Amino acid sequence: MGKTNDWLDFDQLVEDSVRDALKPPSMYKVILVNDDYTPMEFVIDVLQKFFSYDVERATQLMFAVHYQGKAICGVFTAEVAETKVAMVNKYARENEHPLLCTLEKA
């Protein structure tokens, strides 16, 4: 009798593991935050360089950042979002701009 229960427990464990492995990853919004010092052209450059937007869409997003205070640049898995945030913030500091890029759970 104990062996049947052991197999049922094992089957449940495998089923739970497979279900957990198949869950979609958590997604995160990458957000640019407005400031009074970063040039609009630099924000457009960031949107093209790190998010692959064409100049028209990058300009639209830049104006959203400017007038609304922030804008979502994209939604990514945690690892991709963290990498993009780090790269944008590093690039902004290297170019002596206070532009801030953040992430939040989608």
Swiss-Prot record:
It comes from Salmonella gallinarum (strain 287/91 / NCTC 13346). This is ATP-dependent Clp protease adapter protein ClpS. GO terms for biological process: protein catabolic process; proteolysis. Binds to the N-terminal domain of the chaperone ClpA. Belongs to the ClpS family. It comes from the Bacteria. InterPro entries: ClpS, ClpS_core, Ribosomal_bL12_C/ClpS-like. Involved in the modulation of the specificity of the ClpAP-mediated ATP-dependent protein degradation. Transmembrane segments: none annotated. SUPFAM superfamilies: ClpS-like. Pfam families: ClpS.
